[in-house]
Amino acid sequence: MADTIKHTPMMQQYLAVKADYPNQLLFYRMGDFYELFYEDAVKASELLEITLTARGKSGGNPIPMAGIPHHSAEGYLAKLVKLGQSVAICEQIGDPSISKGPVERKVVRVITPGTLVEDALLEDKSENLLAAIFQQADEYGLATLDVASGRFEATLLPDSTQLSAEVERLKPAEIILPDDPLFKQNLPESIQNRPGLVDYPSWHFEKDSCRKRLIDHFGTQDLVAFGCDQLPAVISAAGVILHYAQSMLQNTLAHVFSLQTYQADDALALDAMSRRNLELDTNLTGGKNHTLFAILDNATTAMGSRLMNRWLNQPLRNRDIINDRFNAIEDIIEQHSQEEFRSALKPIGDLERILSRVSLYSARPRDILHLGRSLNQLPELQALLKQQTANKWQQLSKQLGLYPELASQLETALVESPPMLMRDGGVFAEGYDSELDELRNLKNQAGDYLLALEAREKERTGITTLKVGYNRVHGYYIEVSKLQSDNVPADYVRRQTLKAQERYITPELKEFEDKVLSANEKALAREKWLYQQLLERLNQDLQALQRTAAALAETDVLVSLARQAINLNLTRPTLSSEPGIDIKQGRHLTVEALSNQPFIPNDTCFDEQRRLQIITGPNMGGKSTFMRQTALIAIMAYMGSFVPAESATLGPIDRIFTRIGASDDLTSGRSTFMVEMTETANILHHASPESLILMDEVGRGTSTFDGLALAWAIAEQMAQSIQGYCLFATHYFELTTLVEQFNNTVNIHLSAIEHQDKIVFMHQVEEGPASQSYGLQVAALAGVPTAVIDKAKKHLHRLENQTAAQQQTSGTASSAKESVQQFDLFAQPALPEAIETMLTDLKALSVDDLTPRQALEKLYEVTNTVKNASE
C-alpha cells in the first residue's frame, strides 16, 4: 500500500493495523459500521454482494470502501467463513469523547474457518476442527482442536496414506502447515487440494518451543501424562495448533485442559474413497440426506448428534468398550426407559459449546439461560441413570455430577427471556441484586414523575395541550404548539423546533433527566459487572461442567441408538475373537428407508473356505447394495450400534476397503481407469487377512482383455496372498473358474428371472455363478430404443454361434454349460507342428559333440524352420 505519510490520521491508523493482518479481511469499526478499504473492500463487495463506494481521497486517490452494520455482522461473517475467508475484527476501544485524533482501535479477534466459537457461524451437528500437520523422518504428527468444545487430540501416523485417511475422517475446516513449499508438495494430493490450508512460519514448529508451550499451558513438568512425551512430530503439531488458536482468539483457551494422544489403529480404518462410497455422513452428491448418519441420528441434543457422528466415523476395535455400549443399549430397551430419557434430555442445551464461550468470556445471556435450564435437569437424569443396571450407565451417573447451588443461582439470576446481547441490558431478574434494583426503580418511577410534572405545568402555564415526552436523540422535553409558544414561562429553554410544535426543557426536567440517564448508565454498568462475576463463577467449575457435558452427550447417543434399534428392528451383534463374518438376513438401512417395496434381506458368510466370493449377476440386480450393506453392518457393529440383521457375528476387522464406482478426477488429470487402478493399488498394498474388501467391476475401464487380465490377477492375489474377507463383483464370467484353483473361493450370484423377454430382479443372493448377465434386458428397462435392442440380439446370437464353433473346433466344448462360457484367456496357444518337431530334436541334441561346421548348419536349419512356420 502507499506510504502512510500521504494519508489522513485515520487512514494511517487503518494501514498500520492492516499491515499486521495482510491475509485477512479487516473489519474496521467506525461507529455503527464495520468498514473495509482498498483491496478488502473490492473483495468483500464481490463475495457479499454489497455496494462498493469510495471514502473521499487519501494520498490523492479515491479510497475503495464497503461497509456492513455491526449489529448484522454475524450473517456476513458466516457467509465469508463458508467461502473460506478469514476476518480480523478491529474494534474501537478508546472513548471518542476524550480522544485527540483517531479513536484508539485494536484487533480483538481473528475469525478463521477452524477457530469458530460463535453459535451463528457453526453447524449444530458437525464438529469444526482446526488441524496441524508436521513431518519427522517418514512419520507425520497430526493434531486437531475443536475450539468450540475444547477437545484436543493428536496422533502419530506412519505414512502419507494413513495421514490422508485420517484427515478425510476428521474433515478439518483449516489445516496449519509449515510454510515450506517442499513440505506441501510431499503431502498427498487429497490434502494439497483441500480448502483451508494455512502456511505458518516454520520456526513455530520447533520442537522445544512447542514442548514448552504445551507444558506451560497445562501446568505440568512434562508431557508423559498425555502420551506424547517421546513423539516430537506430535509435539510440534500440537504446540503449533495451540499457539495459532490462542493468537486468533486473543485468549489463553483455559477450556482446553487436556491433550489426548490416540493410536489410529485403535479404530477400524477406512480410506477416503471408502467413506465416500459407503455414504456414512455425506452422500455421493455432497449432501447430508440419505446417509447412514441421517438414518441413525435420533439424538435429542446437538452435542449428542456430533458424538454420534464421531462414533460412526471412528468405529473402535476394542471389544470391551463396544460391548459396554451394547449392554447399555440392551438395558435401556429391556427397561423401556428410552422415552423417559428423551423427555429429560429435551431441555438440555449445547453445553459443550456454551461452556467454551463461558471460558472465552463471549457467552451471551441466552447461553447462560440454557446452561441454567440444563443444570436443573441433572437430578432427573441422575435418577434415571441410577435405575439402569449396565456398567456404562453407572459410569455416566458418576461422571454427570450435580450443581444445586449453581443451578439455583442461574435460575434466579436471569429474566425469563433475556435479550440477545449483554450490551442491551435487561438481563438480570428483579431481586437478584439490590443495587441494580434501586437504579432500575429510579427509571421505573420516571413515568409517574413525568405525569405529575405534566399536570403541574399545565396548571402553571394554562396550556392544556402541553405534553411531556422523551426521545433518544434529544432526551426529555415539554412540547407545546407554536400557537401557544408565546405563553411559555421564562424558565422554558427551547430544545427543538418542529413544523407545528416547539419543545422545551426546564431546570427541573434537566435535573431529572441527568439523574435518570445516570441511573440507566449505572444500571447497565452494574449489569455488565454482574455478568462478568457470573462468568467467573462458572469458570470455577469449568472442567467439572465439561465432564458433565461429555456424560450428557454419551447418554444421548446411547438413548438414540436404543430408540433406533426398536424403530428399525435392529439386533445386538456378537463380536468374536475368531476370524469370520456371519450375517443372517442382513439389510441396507438407507436403501430400505428409500424403497417403496419390501427390502429383500440376504446372508453374508465368510469363513476359511469362503474368503474370496466372486459375485456375478445382472446390473441392477443388487450386487452393490449387498456389498455395501455388509460393510455398513460391520461399521455399525464396531461403533457400538445394533445392526439390521436377524443375527450377526463378526470376527476381528482392521480395515474396510471399497472399490465401487469411479469417475474422472479432472482436477488431477486422472482418467476413470487411473482412479480405479490407484484405489486398487492402495488395497493391494494395505489389505490384510482381517480386512473387509469390496471390489466392484475391477478392470472395466480398459479394453476387454486388459481388464480381464487385471481382474483375474487381482482376484488371484486376494485369494492367494491377502486372504481377506473379499466380495468381488464382476461381469467377467471367466473368474468363476477360480473356485477350481483356490479352496478359499466360492461363487455367489444375485438371482433374476426372465419372463417374456423381460427381467425380474429377485435381489436374492444364491450360491454358484449366474447363468447369464441379462444385459439386453436391463438396456430395454433403461429405455434403449427397440430397434437397437433387436440389432443387439442379432449381434449376440452371431457372437454366441462363433464362440460355440471355435470351442467345438478346439475340442473344449465338453458340455452345454461350457459352450456358453467365454474362452480361457490364459490358456497357452498351440505351437505349429514343425516347431514342436524342432524343439524335440533340439532337446535330444548333444551340443558338445558338434563340430563348428555342424553347429552352424544346425543354426541355419533352426532359422529356416522358424521363418517357414511364421509365414
From Swiss-Prot:
GO biological process: mismatch repair
PROSITE patterns per record: DNA_MISMATCH_REPAIR_2
GO terms for MF: ATP binding; ATP-dependent DNA damage sensor activity; damaged DNA binding; mismatched DNA binding
Binding-site residues, ATP: G617, P618, N619, M620, G621, G622, K623, S624
Keywords assigned: ATP-binding, DNA damage, DNA repair, DNA-binding, Nucleotide-binding
Pfam families per record: MutS_I, MutS_II, MutS_III, MutS_IV, MutS_V
GO cellular component: cytosol
UniProt-listed SUPFAM superfamilies: DNA repair protein MutS, domain I, DNA repair protein MutS, domain II, DNA repair protein MutS, domain III, P-loop containing nucleoside triphosphate hydrolases
Family: Belongs to the DNA mismatch repair MutS family.
Function, as annotated: This protein is involved in the repair of mismatches in DNA. It is possible that it carries out the mismatch recognition step. This protein has a weak ATPase activity.
Cited PANTHER family: DNA MISMATCH REPAIR PROTEIN MSH1, MITOCHONDRIAL (PTHR11361:SF34), DNA MISMATCH REPAIR PROTEIN MUTS FAMILY MEMBER (PTHR11361)
Protein's UniProt name: DNA mismatch repair protein MutS
Name of the encoding gene: mutS
